[in-house]
């Protein structure tokens, strides 16, 4: 009985982890080679994501890693550049797609519309 409670606790925790495990699909159709890793030390900060190499080709198609909705779109001349944030309600996570060369036509239309509305480019 002395070992039963700790064993039961560990078993419950392991089962819980298996039930809550997330399965995401890769955001690209080619082999994922990383050029930057999460937590990597940079000159003045820790890297907060992963950077996927694009086989030297700009404009590769990417896709969402899981079901969700676009919760934020941003365009900046520094930092992430063109970036899309997807919220995944089933998990409570947000995935960030940064350093994009271009948006889809639909998102690009919405971005331009908002820029003209705010007269901010």
Q: PLM features: residue spans?
A:
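Sec-dependent N-terminal signal peptides
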Residues: 4-15
């Amino acid at each position: 009985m002395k070992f039963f409670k700790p064993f039961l606790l560990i078993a419950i925790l392991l089962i819980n982890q298996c039930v809550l495990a997330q399965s995401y699909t890769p955001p690209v159709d080619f082999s994922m080679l990383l050029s930057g890793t999460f937590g990597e030390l940079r000159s003045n900060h820790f890297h907060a994501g992963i950077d996927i190499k694009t086989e030297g080709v700009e404009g590769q198609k990417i896709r969402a890693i899981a079901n969700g909705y676009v919760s934020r779109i941003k365009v900046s001349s520094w930092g992430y550049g063109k970036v899309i944030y997807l919220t995944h309600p089933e998990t409570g996570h947000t995935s960030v797609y940064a350093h994009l060369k271009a948006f889809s036509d639909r998102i690009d239309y919405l971005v331009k519309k908002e820029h003209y509305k705010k007269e901010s480019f």
